[in-house]
A protein has these predicted regions:
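Structured catalytic-domain cores with a bias toward divalent-metal coordination
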Residues: 1-261
Length: 261
């Protein structure tokens, strides 16, 4: 199994990307494979894109986003590779956001160019990026599951957060088993200060008690979906390992949910 590189110390010091090149790949693949692509309402000069591909006979609807932290390059690369591979099941409607923080990547910063952590802005909407993203999300129909692609520079392996307030069927454990074949799973009992088991965290605190909301909170609290997976690849590992882990996780979640339909 692949080992960590040992480069991260106090932050992410691994391989970086030119986000404009990754988005160019993503947009080219979307055009080639018949996706509808639009700029977020009010995005201005920011390259904030929403993509959709609707199934003619829908069995499952899925929302996927990434690139909200500029020091987490694996997610945008993974989504670009999935669009290029075009291996999505034909009976799944998909709504994608390929990069939510385009100004963070040039400086390899978690925050945007103005110093705002966008993934803590989904309650008060102070940033233009999140305000524009909210406008796009609010115009979407409800979807069955949401998948947010992230990375963690401190993680010992792959892990995820599951938001599932109604305790409906979730595929977290089976997905982790699939990912474990390509990337180590973080087996820590505490991850980011929260209880975890086998790489799975299920937050129990009410979002109403949190003054700052991540993207997943907004989506679930506003009933766009009642099941959200936030995937965290370990960014101290080589880029191909992290990308493979995220792609495997997304593919597994979609297949596992389709199997229950």
């Amino acid at each position: 199994m692949t080992q960590p590189l040992g480069k991260n110390d106090g932050g992410y010091f691994g391989e970086t990307i030119r986000i404009s090149d990754v988005l160019e790949r993503t947009l080219a693949a979307a055009e080639q494979h018949g996706w509808s692509v639009e700029l977020f309402p009010g995005a201005g000069e920011l390259p904030l894109y929403g993509m959709r591909r609707l199934a003619k006979r829908e069995r499952l609807s899925v929302y996927i986003s990434t690139g909200i932290h500029g020091d987490e390059p694996g997610g945008p690369v993974a989504l670009a590779e999935m669009l290029e591979a075009n291996a999505w099941p034909s009976d799944v409607s998909l709504y994608l956001c390929p990069c939510l923080n385009p100004t963070g990547f040039p400086g390899n910063t978690r925050e945007n160019l103005a110093g705002i952590d966008l993934n803590r802005d989904y309650r008060h909407f102070k940033s233009p990026e999140v305000t524009a993203h909210k406008a796009w999300i609010d115009g979407l129909p409800e979807f069955d599951i949401a998948i947010c692609l992230h990375e963690d520079w401190e993680a010992k392996g792959f892990y995820l957060y599951e938001l599932n307030p109604e305790k409906q069927f979730a595929a977290s454990e089976a997905m982790l088993e699939a990912v474990g074949a390509v990337c180590p799973i973080d087996q820590s009992e505490l991850i980011d200060g929260r209880p975890a088991k086998g790489g799975l965290l299920r937050p129990i605190a009410s979002p109403d008690a949190r003054p700052l909301w991540p993207e997943a909170f907004y989506i679930v609290q506003n009933n766009k979906t009642r099941l959200s997976y936030t995937l965290e690849a370990p960014s101290d590992f080589p880029m191909p390992t992290r990308v493979d882990a995220l792609c495997t996780a997304v593919k597994s979640l979609i297949e596992l949910h389709l199997a229950t339909r």
